[in-house]
Amino acid sequence: MATSSLTKPQMRWPSGPRRLRFHIVGAFIVSLGVATFYKFAVAEPRKKAYADFYRNYDSMKDFEEMRKAGIFQSAK
């Protein structure tokens, strides 16, 4: 039996691979931009806010305020 190799189907657009490469590169660039924006617009300010809060945080003071307010039943 003689076997013949099948031919690959022709792409729909003549510029198909080039267009696909353009969109993949574009999507990669956009995703890097969004990740960078999120890091500097959301994550860094949040990290700074947490650091500022815990720099001056006194857990014993908060505990005493909650105890005086009557939140805890076991610590009177």
From Swiss-Prot:
InterPro entries: Cytochrome_c_oxidase_VIc, Cytochrome_c_oxidase_VIc/VIIs, Cytochrome_c_oxidase_VIc_sf
GO cellular component: mitochondrial inner membrane
Tree of life domain: Eukaryota
Transmembrane segments: 14-55
SUPFAM superfamilies in UniProt: Mitochondrial cytochrome c oxidase subunit VIc
UniProt record, GO biological process: oxidative phosphorylation
Assembly notes: Component of the cytochrome c oxidase (complex IV, CIV), a multisubunit enzyme composed of 14 subunits. The complex is composed of a catalytic core of 3 subunits MT-CO1, MT-CO2 and MT-CO3, encoded in the mitochondrial DNA, and 11 supernumerary subunits COX4I, COX5A, COX5B, COX6A, COX6B, COX6C, COX7A, COX7B, COX7C, COX8 and NDUFA4, which are encoded in the nuclear genome.
Its job: Component of the cytochrome c oxidase, the last enzyme in the mitochondrial electron transport chain which drives oxidative phosphorylation. The respiratory chain contains 3 multisubunit complexes succinate dehydrogenase (complex II, CII), ubiquinol-cytochrome c oxidoreductase (cytochrome b-c1 complex, complex III, CIII) and cytochrome c oxidase (complex IV, CIV), that cooperate to transfer electrons derived from NADH and succinate to molecular oxygen, creating an electrochemical gradient over the inner membrane that drives transmembrane transport and the ATP synthase.
Protein name: Cytochrome c oxidase subunit 6C
Higher taxonomy: Eukaryota, Metazoa, Chordata, Craniata, Vertebrata
Gene name of the record: COX6C
